[in-house]
Each structure stands twice: as C-alpha cells, then as structure tokens.
Design a protein with these regions (language model features):
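Short hydrophobic beta-strand element within catalytic cores of glycosyltransferases
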Residues: 238-241
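Conserved acidic donor-binding segment of nucleotide-sugar-dependent glycosyltransferases
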Residues: 254-263, 271-276
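Carbohydrate-associated surface elements
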Residues: 97, 119
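Aromatic "clamp/platform" in nucleotide-sugar-dependent glycosyltransferases that forms part
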Residues: 221
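Short alpha-helical donor nucleotide-sugar binding micro-motif in glycosyltransferases
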Residues: 200-201, 208-213
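Nucleotide-activated donor-binding/catalytic signature segment of Leloir-type glycosyltransferases, i.e.
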Residues: 181-201
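Conserved donor-binding/catalytic core segment of Leloir-type glycosyltransferases
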Residues: 132-158, 283
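A conserved catalytic-core segment of Leloir-type glycosyltransferases
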Residues: 1-29
Length: 313
C-alpha cells in the first residue's frame, strides 16, 4: 500500500515518487487515449504512465523553476522538468513567455511547444461585489509575497505615490517568505500609516477586496501567466501589470510597465486615482475585455492538440 497524502509533505520528492507509483497502477488498470501532466510535480508520474501504457504524453507548463527562483534554479527540480519535457510528445505552455523559456532554457524544439493562454471563471453574480464609498483611494497587491512576485517594487512605488499625495492607501494581501522584509521596508520608507498587511485571502475574500480597490498591481518579475489581473478587471478594478507576465500578451486594457520601473508604476497609480476619466475607461473597457476571455476557447485549443498528438501529427 502506497502512502499518498495529496498535499505538500516535508519530503516532497518522496511524495512525487508515491504519486508516480499510483499513476503506474492506474496506467495498468484504466483505458485511456492520452496522458496530461500538469507541472513538474506530476511529470515523473506522466512519464512512467507513458512507459507502461504506450500512450502519448502531453505536459502542461504553468511555471518553471526559472520563474520561481529568479534564475537561481534548483538542479533537482530542473532535472525533473527537463526529463518530463524531453519525454513528452507535446508541451503546452500558458503563455508565449513560458514557451520561450521552455525552448531556450530546456532545449525543446519549437514545433513541439504550443501556447494555450489561461482564462478566468465567469462570476455567477458580479453585481454582488460592490465598491464602498471612502475618502482615500485603495491600491492592492494580492498574491504570494515572494521574490517572483516583486513585492518590493510595489512598496517602492507606493512610497513615490505618497510623496505626491496622501489620499491613497496600499494593501499587500498574501503571505510568503518576504513578508517580514516588506513590513520592515514599509517602516523604513515611513509609510506604515498608509500600508496594510491583511494576510492570506481566498475565495470570496479575494473578489471582495478586488472589487473594493481602485487599482490592482501585479509587479511580477517573472509571471508565466497571472490570472489575478483578470479577476480584478472582472469586478471593475483597473490593473497595472508587468511586461514580464504572460497575461500581458492578451490584455489590451491594462497598463503595462517593466517590473523594475517603479517611477512608471507610480505614475500609472497616480493617474488612475487622480483622473476619473482614466479610471472609468480602464474599469469599463477592462471588464468588457476580460468577459470575452473564456475557458471554453482554451479548451478547444487543448482538444486540437490532443487530436494532433493522438493522430501522430
């Protein structure tokens, strides 16, 4: 009997091995046409299932260790990712940004790698998420507080905005290994009275804080896709995103800056909170744009790739 918890244990590699064993049992006992593995944790299981069943393997790259580590790659993780890609019959990536990484950093042939952009789940009752009246404007960062997400650039941009106006508050919602460092940085910049750290949020809390925000910012250093700006725009919150994000490839009505350009980021925040016409335009056009980005269309692309792989191209 294999012990498989289905969550991240202290020994993650052991859990990956257990999952691989479970996949081998399923590959022996089930009838199927294709194997679809999502990210490096499941690549060994997918490869093993392919070896046992002889069925083609498609892997789905949602992120690589280059994204998570800012280039300080874990050699064990890289080796697992590389083997999964080498053994796969086809590779799906969530953006052209990720596709280039797979081709350039993992040596994969371009014809073997396709892009299928993510989408966002439609809200059943979007009107229930309302923006509250308040004197100060609210600017929000929501996500893991880790180096991949660029939280320090958000803090520095906030300091620049608050040097020009005091009618703005900033929220850094989430948790991560850089949280204490960000709390210290906020104190060093003298903006603690305008900065809030509400902690990790999930589910309805996320929609509520985004709907109540005047600006959402995703200053990621390397973001394979980034669904959170779509979630923000869906509830009418204008978004500022980094050029170094996959969602920048499909969003026309979000402001884009380089993650390191805190002056451009601060200027964009200031413009949105100070010019009602700009806020209104980004709010309305962004919401309309995101409502037309559908999982159904992504599913059609996945199905076409399945057909190509099963039929041997």
């Amino acid at each position: 009997c294999v012990g498989f918890s289905g969550r991240y244990p202290d020994n993650l590699l052991e859990e990956i091995g257990n999952y691989e064993a479970v996949a081998s049992v399923l590959a022996h006992s089930l009838q199927f046409d294709i194997i679809h593995s999502h990210d490096w944790l499941t690549y060994p299981a997918g490869v093993f299932a392919k070896q046992i069943s002889g069925k083609p393997l498609v892997i789905h790259v949602h992120a690589t260790d280059f994204d998570r580590s800012r280039g300080n790659v874990n050699p064990t993780v890289y080796a697992i990712e590389k083997r999964g890609m080498d053994e796969a019959d086809h590779i799906m990536c969530v953006s052209e940004l990720t596709r280039r990484t797979v081709i350039e950093k993992y040596g994969q042939p371009p014809h073997k790698v396709s892009t299928v952009h993510n989408a966002v789940e439609p809200l059943a009752n979007p009107e229930e998420f309302v923006k509250h009246d308040r004197k100060d404007k609210l600017v929000t960062f929501l996500g893991r507080i880790t180096m991949q997400k660029g939280p320090e650039y958000f803090v520095e941009a906030a300091a620049r905005v608050l040097a020009k106006t005091d009618g703005v508050r900033f929220v850094m919602a989430g948790s991560g290994d850089m949280m204490n460092k960000m709390i210290d940085l906020v104190a060093q910049r003298g903006i603690a009275d305008k900065f809030h750290f509400p902690g990790f949020m999930r589910g309805r809390q996320v929609q509520e804080v985004l709907a109540d925000s005047d600006v959402y910012i995703m200053p990621s250093v390397s973001e394979p896709f980034g669904i959170s700006p779509l979630e923000a725009m869906q509830v009418g919150c204008p978004s500022i995103i980094s050029h170094q994000s996959g969602c920048a490839e499909i969003l026309s009505h979000a402001i884009k800056t380089d993650y390191w350009d805190i002056d451009a980021m601060a200027d964009a925040i200031y413009a949105i909170v100070k010019y009602p016409a700009m806020y209104k335009s980004l709010r309305e056009l962004g919401r309309d744009e995101v409502n037309n980005i559908k999982w159904y269309d992504a599913g059609l692309k996945v199905r076409r790739i399945y057909d190509l792989v099963i039929n041997g191209y």
